[in-house]
């Protein structure tokens, strides 16, 4: 059985109320039509506290980008600053889950699939 990362957390991203904050490393400034999709969920993964990755996905599995951070705390702080009040509470990915990326997409889909009905 493969070992799991020490830290695996997800947080849903609600509707953005302000201007979208994005940092592009190439072709800046980028045409908004060419930007990656706005995510419905973020996944934070870290093997140790030396570095952490944040991955962004839509509820339909579209990749919305990723960022490398120096630590879990920095990843959380920068992600919370990026999405402000739109970022909901962080929740741990259950230990028994093997694929945290698939879990994140499924988690978002199950919680957001009926949002247009409200």
Report residues per predicted region.
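Mixed-charge, Lys/Arg-enriched low-complexity segments
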Residues: 64-118
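Intrinsically disordered, low-complexity boundary segments flanking structured domains
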Residues: 1, 55, 76-78
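Short, surface-exposed beta-strand/loop "edge" segments at domain boundaries and coil↔beta transitions
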Residues: 18-21, 61-65
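Intrinsic-disorder/low-complexity peptide segments enriched for small residues
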Residues: 10, 14, 41-42, 110
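Negatively charged, low-complexity tracts enriched in Asp/Glu with abundant Ser/Thr
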Residues: 1-35, 115
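Short aromatic-glycine-(Arg/Gly/Cys) micro-motifs in beta-strand/loop hairpins
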Residues: 36-64
């Amino acid at each position: 059985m493969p070992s799991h990362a020490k830290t695996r957390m997800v947080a849903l991203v609600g509707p953005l109320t302000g201007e979208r904050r994005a940092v592009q490393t190439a072709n800046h400034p980028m045409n908004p039509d060419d930007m990656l999709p706005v995510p419905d969920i973020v996944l934070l993964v870290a093997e140790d506290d030396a570095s952490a990755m944040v991955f962004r996905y839509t509820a339909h599995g579209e990749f919305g980008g990723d960022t490398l951070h120096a630590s879990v705390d920095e990843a959380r702080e920068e992600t919370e600053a990026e999405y402000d009040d739109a970022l909901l509470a962080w929740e741990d990915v259950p230990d028994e889950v093997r694929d945290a990326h698939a879990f994140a997409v499924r988690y978002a889909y199950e919680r957001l699939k009926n949002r247009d009905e409200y």
